[in-house]
Amino acid sequence: MKITRLELTMIRPRWMFLQMHTDRDLIGYGEPILEGQAPAVAEAVKMMEEYLIGKDPRRIEHHWQALYRGGFYRGGPILTSALSGIEQAMWDLLGKSLETPVYQLLGGAVRERVKVYAHVGGDTTEELCTRSKALATQGFSVLKTSFAPPVAYLENQAFVESCTERFATLRNVVGPEVDLAIDFHGRFSPAMSKRMIRALEPYYPFFIEEPCLPGNTDALVELRNSTTVPLATGERLFTKWGFRDLIQRQAVAILQPDLCHAGGIGEVKKIAAMAEACDLAVAPHNPLGP
């Protein structure tokens, strides 16, 4: 089997899908996308297409290494997101050629049920609570929310109390049986994040995501040492090399590699194995395609 061409389809507001065509009339599907940067990722895919034409898509690891290592500048959000979608399409073709689901090729199913969470927001606390109650009624046992306003390097007492009151009200509405996580989106400085987490601790956050920018491992370690709340990060990190320091230093409790950004299916599986060796949890990230 040989790759004959790559075809990209963009769908607003932020989806992009790859079709990898072959000489056997099999098509592999992938999702090479980076939020807000779809045209740039598309150009990266077209650049990689030149290498892929005429190659056997079933040599997934070989092509991944060739595409990643072949350039002087490696990695980063654009190139690795393009490579992620290409790698997904190659896995899809391998599974289709063997008439075997990809999860079987990866070692088979290990569980029958997986806990998922719903992201919930609202312009007002009342709206947030109403939506959260509805999701809990649907059966979601974990919800995640965030603080919408822009955050200065240091915020005043009123800001901290407002955010805390909103989360406390939500906790009282859904009760202790529903876990509540918070996404800081890396908007908080390490100093402000430490203060904010301390204020939220009495309301038992399930985890806090991106308490500061993900590349600041020193700050994450300091935050980890200052709280009992589990910390999470990883959606803006790329490849096993990007996660290595974070894992070795056990800077967070939960890693969130994104299947469309971190390098694809096989690369995320490697990251998960590295995390397992350090007793860290993995929650694969992907809020993209349908």
Language-model regions, residue ranges each:
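Structured beta-strand/loop patches that form or line metal/cofactor-binding pockets in enzymes
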Residues: 1-29, 33
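Conserved, mostly hydrophobic/aromatic
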Residues: 3, 25, 48, 86, ...
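Metal- or metallocofactor-binding catalytic centers and their adjacent structured scaffolds
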Residues: 21-98
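Active-site flanking residues adjacent to catalytic metal/cofactor-binding acidic residues
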Residues: 30, 182-184, 209, 234, ...
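Shared catalytic-loop signature of beta/alpha-barrel
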Residues: 43-48, 62, 198, 204-207, ...
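Glycine-rich, aromatic-flanked loop segments that form ligand/cofactor-binding clefts
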Residues: 87-123, 127
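A generic structural signal for well-ordered alpha-helical segments
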Residues: 94-95, 174, 224, 275
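Metal-dependent enolase-superfamily TIM-barrel catalytic cores that perform enediolate-based chemistry
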Residues: 113-226
